């Protein structure tokens, strides 16, 4: 877990959620620096969550943000399992339907922004509904 300094100067442990939120903010800023536009964050649909929804031109980009301190267990990108991909696809499908769209009518893709240590890896079109 990450730590942050407090007013007293002693570090305080961040919760897993706080750590995840901080990396999602970093990913959003990083992607905006690459020209993507922010749409939404932490989108929940029936138990699934999408970290970020961005736009690149006319493409809706669903982004999964991952962080690992090291590559010891495969790094951040390797942690997006088939099961997680399935859940992200289902959540995106529901979000699109709520916004009068579908995979057939909206140009979209699924990206992963993976932070491993101090490295950033942007995997465009990491998986799709045909995977």
Swiss-Prot record:
Residue stretches of biased makeup (Polar residues): 1-19
Domain of life according to the entry: Bacteria
Ranges in a coiled coil: none
Ranges where the record places region Disordered: 1-20
Pfam families hit by this protein: UPF0102 (PF02021)
Any GO molecular function: nucleic acid binding
Family, similarity comment: Belongs to the UPF0102 family.
HAMAP family registered for this protein in UniProt: UPF0102
Name of this protein: UPF0102 protein YraN
Organism: Escherichia coli O8 (strain IAI1)
